[in-house]
C-alpha cells in the first residue's frame, strides 16, 4: 500500500512539473509569436529576426566556444586516466572506487557532456547581457579620431576594449577552473593507481603544462588590457578625468614589468619542471612579478610622488594630461566646433532699440508652456476624458511668415473616466484614441482674449493649420491595448467623426483575422474577454505598445530618447518627432556624466553622445521611421551595418516634417553642462577653474508666498541671426553666469544656422555670445531683483494680490539686440478658487536699468523706448547704434 502511495505521489509531482513546463513553453511561444506579428505590422519583420539571430548566434557562439574548451580538455584528460583493468575483477572495497573512477575514463559522455554544458553556460552568462555591445565589436568602424595617450584610434577603445575585457575575464575563469579540475582528475587517478609512486604520464604532464601556460597568457593579456583601463581613471576628479603623471609614469611601467615577468617566469618554471633547469630565472621572475604587483597595490609610493612631485607643481606636472582630458571631452560631446563671439556690452544708459525688433515682436513667447497646460485643459479639453500631456513649442508658416507657436495633442486619458465607466468595453473598444490638437501663437496681449490658431473638435482654424485625420491612437499617455475597428457604433465619444472606431483604416496593429490569433492575443494580454467578445470582427486589429516612447524602446532599445517629444500638425495627419541619441561610456579620456533620458528607469552614465537620429511616429497608425542626421557618428554607423534597412537618410523625410526639425533640448542641456567647465581649453585656466560657468538662476515665487531659486531652463525662440539674411532661425537659448555669481557671462544659442547652410531647417552648431568683463551685464536673477524693486510694478502687484487672485511671473526671455540685451517677462494671474485658468495680465520689459510694464509687447516696447530716450537726454549720453560692428553680432 505504501508503495502505491509513493508511486501516485511521484506521478502527481511529475504531472505538475510537466504541466508547469508546458504552460511556460506556451506563454513563451505566445509572447514570441505576438511580438513577431507586432514587428511585422510595422514592416520590421526582417529586423525582428535579425535581432533574434544576432542575440542567439552571439550568445550561443560564445557558449559553444567555452563548451568546446571544457569538453575537449576533459576528453583529452580521460585518455590519460589509466587505472589497471585487472583491479576491476577484484571484489575488494577499493575496487568500488575504481569502478566509480571508470566513469571518467575514455571521455564518457554521461559525465563530461552535462558538466561541460553547465560550466560553459556559467562562464558565458555575462555575454548574454552584452550581446548588443558585441554587435558594435563586429560592425562599428574606426572612429577616425586618434586618442591622445597611446595614439590609437578612439574606436578601438570605444567598441573593442569593453568586449575584450569581458572575454579576457571569462577566459581566465574558464582556464583557471579547467586547470584545477583537470589537475584534480589526474591526481585522483594517480592516487588510485597501483603505480601511484611512478611519475605522472608524460601526456598528462604536457596537458597540465599547456593549461598553466594558457592561464599565464590570459593573465598577461589582462595586464595588457589594464593598460587601456588607465584611460578611464577618475582618481584626479574633480580636477580632471583620466590618467595623470602617476598612472602613466608609475603604474604603466609596472604593468609592463608584470607582463614580462609573468610570461618569462611561467616559461622558466615549465622548463624547470621538464628539464630541471632555469629555477633561478623562474624564482627571479616570480620575485619581480610579486614586487611589481605589490608596488601597484601599495599606495605609499604614489602618495610620495603626489606629495613631493605633483602637488608642489600641479599644473606643470599634469599639464599634458589635463589637455588630453579637455580635447577628448570636447570631441566626445561634439563641442569641438563651437563658435564664440566676444561682445562688449553697450555702456549703461546708451542702449537703443533696433527698429527691426518690432518686426519680430510676434515671435517673442510670452506664454510659458507650463502655464498653458492649465489653459488648454480648461478651455479646450472639451470632454472629461481628454487631456493635454505636454505643451510644445514650434514654428509654422502662417499668412506668409514664420510664427512661433505653442501646441499640444488632445489625447485620451482613461484615468479621467468615472469609476463606473472603466469597464473592459469602454477601455478597449470605445474610448480608444484622442482627437486633434490645439495651436496658439506664442506672442499674445494681456488686454485681448486668448488667440487660437487651431481649436475645438472640428479642427477649426482661421489660418489653415487644420488636418484631415486628427485621430491620435499613439501618443505620450500610457494606454492599454485597443481593438479597432469593431462593431460598436461610436457617436461623439472618442472623436468628432461618427463611427470612427468602426472605420479605422490604419495598419498599426496586429490583425485578429482568425480564432487562433484571438486566442493567442488573449493569452498574451492575460485577458479572456478579448477571446469571448462579440464586438470584434475579422477586420479588427489589436493596437498595443501605444506609448510612443515604449514603442520606440521596444524596437530600438539601444537608442536614448529625448525627454521632449513634440507633435507636428500637417494637412494630412499628426506626427510625433522624437530626438534619439547614441551614447557610450567608453570614449577614451572623456569626462563621464549621468543623465536620465525619456523612458529610462534610472540615470545612465556615458562619456560620448551624438544626436544622430530623428524618429517620426505617425499618431494615427503608429508607423516608425528612423532618419539619420549625423552620418559621421561611428556608433550609428555600426548599427546601420548591423541592421540594414532600418535607418534612412534625412533627405527622405517629408518636407513638412523636415521643416519642424530642431536642435534637441536634452542634447543642448548636456552639452552646456559639460561646456560650462570644458570651455577653459588652456590647462592652466582649467586647473584654476576661474572661469567656470553655471546655468543662470532666478527667484520664483510659489503659491504659498515663498521664493525659491530655480535654474533657467533652455527655451526655444524664433529670431533672425547674423549670417543668414531674412531667415528665421528656431534656436535654443540658454543664459550662463559665472559660478557663484548672478551677472551674465555667456548667452548660448543652440541650432544657429551657419552662413553656408542657411537653407536648412535647423543646424547642429552652437554659438556663444561671450560678454566682456569690462561692462556689467545683468543676469536673470539681477533683472528679477530690479523688477521687485520697481515701486510702480510692486504697487500693481499688491493690488492684484488683494483681489483674491494669485500673481505669477513667468520665465525671463532674453532677446539679443546688437550689443544690448532685452529682457521680457510675462505676468500671469489666476483665481485662488478650485478652477485655475491662468491669464496673461502684463508684459515686463527691461533694458539696462530701466524696467517697464504694459498690457502688450508693443505697448511695453514703446514705453521702454520713451524711457531710454528721456534718460539719455537727461544724462547727455550718446546712444550706441544697435547695428553690429563686429563679426557675429546682429540685430535680432
UniProtKB/Swiss-Prot annotation:
GO cellular component labels: extracellular region; plasma membrane
Transmembrane regions: 7-27, 57-77, 107-127, 163-183, 206-226, 252-272, 281-301
Location relative to the cell: Cell membrane
InterPro entries assigned to the protein according to its UniProt record, in alphabetical order: UPF0182
Membrane topology listed for this record: Multi-pass membrane protein
Keyword Transmembrane helix: yes
Subcellular location, principal: membrane
Record keywords, A-Z: Cell membrane, Membrane, Transmembrane, Transmembrane helix
HAMAP family tied to this protein: UPF0182 (MF_01600)
PANTHER family hit by this protein: UPF0182 PROTEIN SLL1060 (PTHR39344:SF1)
Family: Belongs to the UPF0182 family.
Descriptive protein name: UPF0182 protein MCA2716
Annotated organism of origin: Methylococcus capsulatus (strain ATCC 33009 / NCIMB 11132 / Bath)
Amino acid at each position: 500500500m505504501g508503495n502505491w502511495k509513493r508511486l501516485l505521489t511521484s506521478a502527481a509531482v511529475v504531472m505538475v512539473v510537466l504541466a508547469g513546463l508546458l504552460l511556460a513553453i506556451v506563454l513563451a511561444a505566445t509572447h514570441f509569436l505576438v511580438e513577431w506579428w507586432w514587428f511585422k505590422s510595422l514592416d520590421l519583420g526582417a529586423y525582428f529576426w535579425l535581432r533574434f539571430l544576432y542575440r542567439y548566434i552571439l550568445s550561443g557562439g560564445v557558449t559553444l566556444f567555452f563548451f568546446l574548451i571544457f569538453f575537449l580538455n576533459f576528453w583529452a584528460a580521460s585518455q590519460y586516466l589509466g587505472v589497471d583493468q585487472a583491479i576491476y575483477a577484484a571484489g575488494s572495497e577499493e575496487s568500488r572506487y575504481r569502478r566509480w573512477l571508470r566513469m571518467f575514463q575514455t571521455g564518457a559522455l554521461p559525465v563530461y557532456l552535462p558538466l561541460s554544458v553547465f560550466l560553459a553556460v556559467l562562464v558565458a552568462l555575462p555575454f548574454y547581457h552584452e550581446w548588443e555591445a558585441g554587435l558594435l565589436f563586429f560592425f562599428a568602424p574606426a572612429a577616425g579620431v586618434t586618442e591622445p595617450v597611446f595614439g590609437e584610434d578612439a574606436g578601438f577603445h570605444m567598441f573593442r576594449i569593453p568586449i575584450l575585457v569581458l572575454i579576457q575575464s571569462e577566459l581566465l575563469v574558464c582556464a583557471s577552473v579547467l586547470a584545477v579540475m583537470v589537475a584534480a582528475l589526474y591526481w585522483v587517478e594517480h592516487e588510485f593507481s597501483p603505480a601511484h609512486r611512478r611519475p605522472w604520464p608524460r601526456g598528462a604532464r604536457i596537458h597540465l603544462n599547456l593549461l598553466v601556460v594558457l592561464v599565464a597568457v590570459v593573465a598577461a593579456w589582462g595586464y595588457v588590457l589594464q593598460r587601456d583601463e588607465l584611460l578611464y581613471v577618475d582618481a584626479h576628479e574633480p580636477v580632471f578625468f583620466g590618467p595623470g603623471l602617476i598612472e602613466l609614469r608609475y603604474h604603466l611601467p609596472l604593468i609592463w614589468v608584470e607582463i614580462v615577468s609573468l610570461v618569462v617566469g611561467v616559461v622558466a618554471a615549465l622548463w624547470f619542471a621538464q628539464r630541471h633547469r632555469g629555477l633561478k630565472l623562474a624564482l627571479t621572475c616570480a620575485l619581480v612579478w610579486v614586487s611589481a604587483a605589490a608596488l601597484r597595490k601599495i599606495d605609499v609610493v604614489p602618495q610620495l610622488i603626489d606629495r613631493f612631485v605633483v602637488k608642489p607643481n600641479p599644473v606643470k606636472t599634469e599639464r599634458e594630461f589635463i589637455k588630453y582630458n579637455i580635447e577628448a571631452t570636447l570631441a566626445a560631446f561634439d563641442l569641438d566646433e563651437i563658435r564664440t563671439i566676444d561682445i562688449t556690452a553697450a555702456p549703461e544708459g546708451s542702449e537703443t532699440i533696433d527698429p527691426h525688433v518690432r518686426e519680430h515682436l510676434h515671435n517673442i513667447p510670452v506664454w510659458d508652456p507650463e502655464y498653458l497646460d492649465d489653459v488648454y485643459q480648461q478651455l479646450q479639453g472639451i470632454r472629461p476624458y481628454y487631456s493635454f500631456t505636454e505643451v510644445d513649442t514650434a514654428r509654422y508658416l502662417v499668412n506668409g511668415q514664420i510664427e512661433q507657436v505653442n501646441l499640444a495633442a488632445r489625447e485620451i486619458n482613461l484615468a479621467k473616466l468615472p469609476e463606473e465607466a472603466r469597464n473592459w468595453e469602454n477601455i478597449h473598444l470605445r474610448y480608444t484614441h484622442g482627437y486633434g490638437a490645439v495651436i496658439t501663437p506664442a506672442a499674445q496681449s494681456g488686454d485681448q482674449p486668448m488667440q487660437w490658431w487651431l481649436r475645438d473638435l472640428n479642427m477649426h482654424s482661421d489660418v489653415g493649420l487644420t488636418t484631415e485625420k486628427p485621430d491620435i491612437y499613439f501618443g505620450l499617455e500610457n494606454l492599454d491595448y485597443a481593438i479597432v475597428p469593431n462593431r460598436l457604433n461610436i457617436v461623439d465619444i472618442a472623436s468628432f467623426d461618427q463611427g470612427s472606431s468602426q472605420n479605422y483604416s490604419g495598419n498599426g496593429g496586429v490583425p485578429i483575422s482568425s480564432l487562433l490569433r484571438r486566442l493567442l492575443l488573449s493569452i498574451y494580454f492575460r485577458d479572456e474577454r478579448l477571446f469571448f467578445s462579440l464586438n470584434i470582427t475579422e477586420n479588427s486589429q489589436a493596437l498595443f505598445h501605444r506609448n510612443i516612447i515604449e514603442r520606440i524602446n521596444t524596437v530600438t532599445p539601444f537608442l536614448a530618447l529625448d525627454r521632449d517629444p513634440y507633435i507636428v500638425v500637417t494637412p494630412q495627419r499628426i506626427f510625433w518627432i522624437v530626438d534619439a541619441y547614441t551614447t557610450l561610456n567608453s570614449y577614451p579620456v572623456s569626462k563621464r556624466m549621468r543623465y536620465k533620458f525619456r523612458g529610462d528607469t534610472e540615470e545612465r552614465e556615458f562619456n560620448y553622445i551624438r544626436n544622430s537620429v530623428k524618429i517620426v511616429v505617425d499618431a494615427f497608425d503608429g508607423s516608425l521611421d528612423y532618419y539619420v542626421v549625423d552620418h559621421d557618428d561611428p556608433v550609428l554607423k555600426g548599427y546601420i551595418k548591423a541592421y540594414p534597412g532600418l535607418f534612412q537618410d534625412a533627405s527622405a523625410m517629408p518636407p513638412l516634417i523636415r521643416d519642424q526639425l530642431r536642435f534637441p533640448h536634452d542634447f543642448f542641456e548636456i552639452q552646456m553642462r559639460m561646456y560650462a567647465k570644458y570651455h577653459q581649453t588652456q590647462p592652466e585656466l582649467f586647473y584654476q577653474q576661474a572661469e567656470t560657468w553655471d546655468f543662470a538662476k532666478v527667484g520664483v515665487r510659489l503659491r504659498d508666498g515663498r521664493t525659491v531659486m530655480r535654474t533657467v531652463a533652455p527655451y526655444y525662440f524664433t529670431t533672425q541671426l547674423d549670417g543668414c539674411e531674412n531667415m528665421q532661425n528656431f534656436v535654443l537659448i540658454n543664459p550662463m553666469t559665472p559660478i557663484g555669481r548672478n551677472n551674465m557671462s555667456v548667452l548660448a544659442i543652440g541650432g544657429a544656422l551657419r552662413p553656408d547652410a542657411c537653407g536648412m531647417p535647423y543646424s547642429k552648431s552652437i554659438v556663444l555670445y561671450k560678454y566682456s568683463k569690462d561692462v556689467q551685464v545683468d543676469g536673470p536673477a539681477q533683472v528679477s531683483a530690479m523688477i521687485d524693486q520697481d515701486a510702480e510694478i510692486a504697487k500693481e502687484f499688491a493690488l492684484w494680490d488683494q483681489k483674491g487672485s494669485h500673481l505669477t511671473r513667468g520665465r525671463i526671455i532674453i532677446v539679443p539686440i546688437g550689443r544690448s540685451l532685452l529682457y521680457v517677462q510675462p505676468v500671469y494671474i489666476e483665481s485662488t478658487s478650485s478652477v485655475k485658468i491662468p491669464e496673461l495680465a502684463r508684459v515686463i520689459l527691461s533694458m539696462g536699468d530701466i524696467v517697464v510694464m504694459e498690457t502688450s509687447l508693443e505697448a511695453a516696447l514703446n514705453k521702454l523706448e520713451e524711457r531710454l530716450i528721456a534718460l539719455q537726454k537727461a544724462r547727455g549720453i550718446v546712444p550706441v547704434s544697435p547695428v553690429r560692428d563686429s563679426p557675429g553680432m546682429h540685430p535680432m
